[in-house]
């Protein structure tokens, strides 16, 4: 249509006699009607909108200047071509038309000419040209200044959610975050700008875009706030690193950790760093590296395989007692087994009444040519947690058939497990593509989950019967953002709170199930875990996080729990106060308050417990301790073991030492040990003796007289965990209450409390 309109206008100029009288009458005498029709038809005729998407963002910025420029060119040429005269018949009118965009007009009317006034088409062309110029100038200015405008918004002291590395396959995460984030939070996107469509959508959500190479300066702008006094404060509550290339994501995460190191976190807030690492083995290595560090922020890996596996296990009904059959060896299969192991650990947690539930684990059957290898993978993968917690049934099949598993193989398995859920976790494209549909038709009582190449996400309802066709998805159920393991632990803590604190007659928002719990309360639960994670180093607790679990877990003492409960309460108060809450005394039962008085308090942002720890009173202090102890019991679910912290001590005192000329047996607290020929026999002032290897003796004793040696050097020591076994060159030693574990140059040993007190001094 647009080309037809342009053709008619061109014929009117070049060969007006060829146009029918009816059409030519519409093109002259400055009639408004035809020109309005032309203006309305031309944009549509040119095909610019084309129904190809919403007219927002960068598309709109390109569309309307183009439409206005096309209108100006057509109407300008219509006005100038008949007036070319002695000038070049085409180039002169074209030059005059282009000059309209700069505000210049070639006058050919008046002074006795044939035309008494400017044609209406020319006036409209001038208006369209100037509008296009202005529109383009404003757009260029906004593009050039967008980075500066973004920096100005980042200067505001606001909490923010940061996304690093945006692409088309992670747009679902952006949409979910933008939909669920707190209204007072700021969304910040750091990206190199290669995917302009993704950045345009981020802009449509109001995100601050920091384009260009992702370096230390931009990371600091996005994640930190620098006060005038020079201190750096972490302002990012969540940081998603979503680079599609795994190594890029890991490198960016390390840069972020370096940026956050040394920055402070305001009381009551927590920062979570979530890194997209799709390979389960690399993700586990990432977590293990950070299982021994005490940081001001929480970190975890995100994976499309893990997020999908959680939903697959939920669909399978395994938690409800249904056996699980896993077919194939893949990243998804390994992630499914990891989720089964996690749910087993959760099921073994003590209930609210303190009773550990009986184990009712269902059968897990692995089917495929590499089923035994998958079982070994699962065992290795769960070593950080003390094992998988279940022994799978391995059904090794022949690799001769396509995909390694035939329908007959699965028929044999389902004969023994007729109610099992079958997860076809083979890589898409391997094996019979109709296996899922055949199983669903042959075994209508079985849930069948099939990983297929053309499927997207995990549907809530089956495709047909009990068949679910799934694809990988980073998002959680309901299109919510991906959940890290800290959020899952926070949900368990919330479930315990709901179980131990009966729901009042008029339920409050804080008693809602996790999926309906307001974000404010969800983040408070995560805050609690983050506070406890980073507070184990306070002097009253003096612990740190160990990687592999110790022989025995050191129970939390009442004094440690009380100290952590006080720290958690102070963090809770800071969190609530920063969100506008204030203290208001509760309504005692003697006043016969209305049943919904706590609901009314919540609406007014009043909290009776928003006061100092001392003012809280013994009863609330006790219950805070109960919730804190439960949260501490949850941390081992992520492989974290809190062991006493090591400190550096100086060796002091003088001993008598002689060289052994023959082996000598000796004992420490009833445990037999042995010194070999050539070892040193050391006796302290109290008369106690023990053997020392020559290399250790040379490094830790200095001769000061005949058979007299001064203890020198430093060691690292910590409180012993009762029952743990320490292996030294002299043999194995079982630690007791009050003992100390010492280590130096890779050698560890146990010292009694009295001997340690007399022979070591805390290094200054």
PLM regions and their residue ranges:
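Surface-exposed intrinsically disordered loops and tails
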Residues: 548, 582-616
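Repeat-associated, polar segments at repeat-unit boundaries in modular proteins
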Residues: 529-544, 628-644, 697, 756
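Structured core of small recognition/catalytic domains
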Residues: 378-396, 741-764
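Ordered core of a single globular domain
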Residues: 616-623, 628
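Short loop/beta submotifs within extracellular cysteine-rich repeat domains
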Residues: 521, 536, 572-576, 580-581, ...
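A motif-centric signal for short, conserved binding hotspots located
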Residues: 645-685, 694-747, 754-756, 762-764
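C-terminal amphipathic alpha-helical interaction region
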Residues: 582-589, 621-622, 631, 635
């Amino acid at each position: 249509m647009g080309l037809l309109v342009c053709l008619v206008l061109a014929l009117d100029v070049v060969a007006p006699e060829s146009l029918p009288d009816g059409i030519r009458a519409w093109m002259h005498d400055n009639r408004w009607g035809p020109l309005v029709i032309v203006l309305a038809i031309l944009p549509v005729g040119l095909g610019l909108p084309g129904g190809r998407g919403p007219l927002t963002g960068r598309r709109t910025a390109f569309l309307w200047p183009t439409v206005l420029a096309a209108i100006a060119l057509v109407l300008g040429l219509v006005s100038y071509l008949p007036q070319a005269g002695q000038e070049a018949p085409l180039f002169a009118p074209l030059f005059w038309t282009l000059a309209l965009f700069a505000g210049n007009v070639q006058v050919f009317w008046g002074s006795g000419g044939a035309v008494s006034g400017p044609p209406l088409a020319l006036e409209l062309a001038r208006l369209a040209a100037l509008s296009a110029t202005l529109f383009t100038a404003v757009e260029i200015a906004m593009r050039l200044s967008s980075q500066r405008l973004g920096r100005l918004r980042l200067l505001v002291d606001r909490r923010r959610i940061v996304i690093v590395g945006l692409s088309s396959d992670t747009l679902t995460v952006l949409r979910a975050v933008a939909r669920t984030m707190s209204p007072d939070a700021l969304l910040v996107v750091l990206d190199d700008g290669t995917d302009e469509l993704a950045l345009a959508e981020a802009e449509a959500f109001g995100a601050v875009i920091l384009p260009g190479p992702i370096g230390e300066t931009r990371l600091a702008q996005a994640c930190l706030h620098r006060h005038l006094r020079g201190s750096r404060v972490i302002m990012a509550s969540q940081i998603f690193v979503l680079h599609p290339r795994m190594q890029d994501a890991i490198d960016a995460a390390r840069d972020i950790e370096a940026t956050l190191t040394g920055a402070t976190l305001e009381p009551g807030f927590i920062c979570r760093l979530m890194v997209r690492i799709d390979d389960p083995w690399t993700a586990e290595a990432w977590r293990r590296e950070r299982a021994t560090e005490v940081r001001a922020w929480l970190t975890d890996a995100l994976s499309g395989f893990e997020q999908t596996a959680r939903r697959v296990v939920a669909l399978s009904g395994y938690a409800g007692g249904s056996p699980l059959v896993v077919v194939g060896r893949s990243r998804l299969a390994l992630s499914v087994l990891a989720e089964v192991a996690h749910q087993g650990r959760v099921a073994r947690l003590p209930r609210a009444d303190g009773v550990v539930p009986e184990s009712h684990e269902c059968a897990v059957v692995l089917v495929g040519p590499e089923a035994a290898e998958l079982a070994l993978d699962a065992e290795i993968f769960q070593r950080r947690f003390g094992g998988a917690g279940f022994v799978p049934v391995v059904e090794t099949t022949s690799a001769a058939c396509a995909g390694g598993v035939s329908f007959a193989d699965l028929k044999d398995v389902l004969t023994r497990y007729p109610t099992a859920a079958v997860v076809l976790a083979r890589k898409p494209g391997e094996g019979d593509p109709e296996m899922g549909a055949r199983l669903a038709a042959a075994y209508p009582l079985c849930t069948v989950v099939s990983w297929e190449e053309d499927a997207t996400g995990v549907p809530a309802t089956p495709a047909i019967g009990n068949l679910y066709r799934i694809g990988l998805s980073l998002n959680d159920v309901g299109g919510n953002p991906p959940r890290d393991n800290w959020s899952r632990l926070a949900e368990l803590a919330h479930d315990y709170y709901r179980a131990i604190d009966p729901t009042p007659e008029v339920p409050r928002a804080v008693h809602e199930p996790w999926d309906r719990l307001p974000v404010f309360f969800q983040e408070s639960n995560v805050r609690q875990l983050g506070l406890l994670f980073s507070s184990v180093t306070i002097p009253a607790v003096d612990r740190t996080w160990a990687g592999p679990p110790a022989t025995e877990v050191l129970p939390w003492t009442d004094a440690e729990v009380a100290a952590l409960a006080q720290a958690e309460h102070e963090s809770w108060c800071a969190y609530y106060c920063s969100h506008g809450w204030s203290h208001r005394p509760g309504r005692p039962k003697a006043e016969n308050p209305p049943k919904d008085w706590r609901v009314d308090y919540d609406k007014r942002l009043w909290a009776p417990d928003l006061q100092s720890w001392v003012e809280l009173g013994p009863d609330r202090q006790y219950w805070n301790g109960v919730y804190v102890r439960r949260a501490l019991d949850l941390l081992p679910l992520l492989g974290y073991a809190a062991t006493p912290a090591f400190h550096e001590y100086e060796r002091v005192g003088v001993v008598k030492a002689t060289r052994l000329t023959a082996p000598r047996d000796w004992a420490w607290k009833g445990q037999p040990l042995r010194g070999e020929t050539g070892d040193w026999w050391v006796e302290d002032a109290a008369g106690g003796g023990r053997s020392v290897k020559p290399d250790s003796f040379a490094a830790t004793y200095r001769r000061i007289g005949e058979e007299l040696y001064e203890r020198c050097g430093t060691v690292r020591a910590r409180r012993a965990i009762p029952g743990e076994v320490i292996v030294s060159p002299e043999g194995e030693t079982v630690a007791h209450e009050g003992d100390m574990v010492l280590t130096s140059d890779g050698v560890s040993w146990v010292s009694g409390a009295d001997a340690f007190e007399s022979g070591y001094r805390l290094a200054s």
